[in-house]
């Protein structure tokens, strides 16, 4: 059994819906003997440089005749077909599906499983993280290599495939950032080139320091402490290269490019900042009304702006301090039309009146006659006299049009000096998080802790019955760099352990530090995820699998009266500087979501690709100029990867996206060789790369055309041939008549 270090406990108060937690102060000079935490997340440039890749702009596999952002034919037809190749790590598959959900939540871009389409994306695990730009009108790869399986990195590569280049490639780049050319690695200078408006477009948006497509300050640097790119406004140096999520400008460009007018999974959102309260209505059969109030009164602080702005910051309020016990007020949403069968209603609330007050959530459903009037009670929240805003999640399962309804009920007006508050409502067609951990007074926690100190969450259960939790290191581990917050996952013993499978494998742990931005489309939350495996062992438990039964490999935790396994996560999950930005710490509160999902069904996802000759429209872009690269050393299709890429490539035959013929082992030099260089087509035929095979487009004129695999056979058009035969026949006839007439004259 593991030895434990002495701790002293500092009590903190948290939201009523979670158990009490304590800060565990570790003895100086000791690290956690029962912790196995990964390194800080690496960026794309680091991953690809370590893999020996020297791609265009660092992570773009560039065809020779594609001008993606300016070329309308490079826009994808939605939804985009995709394949998850079986050489992908299981965690990468889950992360890709998670990234898809972000696109669906924040744009009209959608994805569908491949069903034989000519254009599709296949996600594979090669060396590094890279993509092509735009729809190539044939199957194309996105590489999610080792270390690339983070939501933000995957979103970055998908944005390339959708048609976007890097932010610092803009024509006006030098107005906003400085490039330190002497600090760039030799042969990597091309990654910092800019391109004119004929090549890329900014879609009429300003330069975006916060873009997910921007390089970080230390990209491709010679010296790890000296940046290659800095911002002319110094405050943005810590922002460029963020790998949290899409920026607001990223989404503006994406939605403009694909003409999005709405998203797929966001059904409703309301921060109550407008007088029309987002189309919500007061009930007509209740006793009182919800009141639309602002933050101007003392103690009346909204959640959206937390009282930071005068004459702004609105919320809905139901006063429970007067009237009669049992009086109710109803607040109903507009009629909503779901596309999926599950929704998550998230909102912030507080109940400052009597503990007997209640907040009920109802849905009003279609009664099969077209009227939305059939009521069903979903969940009840009891008063707690807590003056702090709390987050709540309610799962709905609506398949027809409906309304959601908030009912406030007065419990004991005589003992109430407040009421019920509502703010920042979001309804999405996504699952609700399994576990929600709220940590209050986070600034005090950061100030009163040192490296190695930790907070442990209460126990949560997933749908299978596994108990789990999160460990927060406010100032990182003892071995971490200063100024970072660490985050790790662990298992708890629970009531269901006897019947559960151990060790628990193929489950993805997802930990999310919530950006409490009221509009879900603009949230830039940090999501970290990994998948459990039998190969994840620790010497601290004699080489046993970390994910075995906690009573077998864990240590006793008196806070939960249960056993807790070794932590697994990140010692430097997010910097304090980034944490202080945006809305991560709204109202001095940190909120962490945690899920534990079974990915076993994703172990085999690859589907066969039929071998066929396809002539995709728009693949041959005649008259267009290739990108002006200016450096022959820049990697292109046939020279983008080293001869020996990755020892971890699967040895069994795989069907590659660029070669859908017979099954064969990946031959990397051939795999990326351009089959049209040199041109195998004769008689001025044009060669087109179709799934890695040379396909000739033969010249056709008014009189002649060429056929054959290499355009080697010439033919005459049938109409012309008939005309020629007729002309020749007429000529012979005329010649015969002329000869006959001449002969008759000579005889006379």
From Swiss-Prot:
The chain crosses the membrane at residues 720-739. Residues 672-712 form the EGF-like domain. Residues 641-668 are annotated as: Disordered. It is found in: Membrane. GO terms for cellular component: membrane; meprin A complex; plasma membrane. Residues 435-596 form the MATH domain. This is Meprin A subunit alpha. The lineage of its organism: Eukaryota, Metazoa, Chordata, Craniata, Vertebrata.
